[in-house]
């Protein structure tokens, strides 16, 4: 069973939002306070967002569907791939190609092309054609692989999408909403939480924070067949929380 504590969130810098001037007004309900012109997120609401997301993910997996992991920014790319692979889920961590959800049948044709090229390389076909043709096919394979490797085994639309930085991944959100696919996302203070089905208020820039959230989603998937949930331990009261925040003189990327 996954155990999440308030202290673990603090240690990962989850509570740090952006500069006050960058606030999206729709995030006000998730703000706890501000410190040095930086918004501090309400970790009680972060914990609730984690719990809701955990339950949704397990429901999706039990229904036989998959969760698509999406995070193309530098801080998220490697983490998204690692955790998606760990839980055997599809992922996009380089570039979102328009239509990956809304025009899925066309994307599947590109995936089939990639698989065909990979097979040709393995079965010796490349050895039977000219070096020029091999070079052209390798360039095509590399281009397709860069953007499609993570969804090669996604045979149907996902049951949910998990996103790091919804402000950056707006096209993903538009496509998922159009198709009625539930969206789980970490929402920082500059984001619009109203377009997210399961918003998790949190720092979407710090690597430790991104890693923590992504691991939680991956853990939910891996534990979906064990009939276990997530244990939330709220081990800090408001006074302790402010004390911890004051002690930590961390800076997030603004």
From Swiss-Prot:
It comes from the Bacteria. Pfam families: Ribosomal_S2. GO terms for cellular component: cytosolic small ribosomal subunit. Keywords: Ribonucleoprotein, Ribosomal protein. The keyword Ribosomal protein applies. GO terms for biological process: translation. GO terms for molecular function: structural constituent of ribosome. The keyword Ribonucleoprotein applies. Belongs to the universal ribosomal protein uS2 family. This is Small ribosomal subunit protein uS2. It comes from Borrelia turicatae (strain 91E135). The gene is rpsB.
